[in-house]
Regions:
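Conserved catalytic core of the tyrosine transesterase superfamily
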Residues: 1-182
């Protein structure tokens, strides 16, 4: 029976205890960080020949992290924004390690000195007034589903809410948002 490596133990503590309980991050953040480390482990296995059961904290070096980030860009064809998200996950883990594995503080500082890439901000495209008017005239208001669709489209237009935010609305939540008057 093999025992977990120091990398595996610290990563489990980071994901299961620190992020979940101490930092109370969202499930989406937790999932994104987990994905970043699944990819890092895959990189270390395929490119560095280090199997997951032999992956130790000594393998978490500035050189390996930079290699991983370049691999994301060059071989996985990810965007600089994705690279930056993966780097943020590694930075968070290394910041956690600074207080738990102080013997390697010098290496942790080197990893934390890796900078994010500059990314281009994408311009938002907006619908013209004519396009919005056309969109709001699409639902068939002679049937209840059409009136419902028009109400949801109007609410999204008037509030700037996203589709998921509208989908997540409940009657009790909408009661505090909408006030009906006679």
């Amino acid at each position: 029976m093999t025992t977990a490596t120091d990398f595996a133990k610290q990563l489990r503590r980071f994901l299961s205890e620190y992020l979940s309980h101490e930092r109370n991050v969202s499930p989406n953040t937790l999932s994104a960080y987990r994905d970043a480390f699944v990819q890092y482990i895959a990189y270390m296995h395929t490119k560095k020949g280090v199997a997951v059961e032999k992956l130790f904290l000594k393998h978490l070096t500035r050189q390996n992290v930079i290699g991983y980030l370049n691999w994301i860009l060059d071989e996985r064809n990810c965007s600089p924004a994705t690279r930056n998200y993966r780097l943020a996950a590694i930075h968070a883990f290394v910041s956690f390690l600074q207080y738990n594995i102080i013997e390697q503080s010098e290496e942790w500082q080197k990893i934390l000195s890796i900078k994010a890439m500059r990314t281009e901000k994408k311009a938002l495209n907006y619908l013209s007034q004519d396009s919005i008017r056309l969109l709001l005239h699409q639902p068939d208001v002679t049937i209840w589903q059409g009136r419902r669709h028009l109400a949801m489209l109007s609410l999204m237009y008037d509030t700037g809410a996203r589709v998921q935010e509208i989908a997540d609305l409940t009657v009790t939540a909408s009661a505090s948002i909408v006030s009906l008057t006679r």
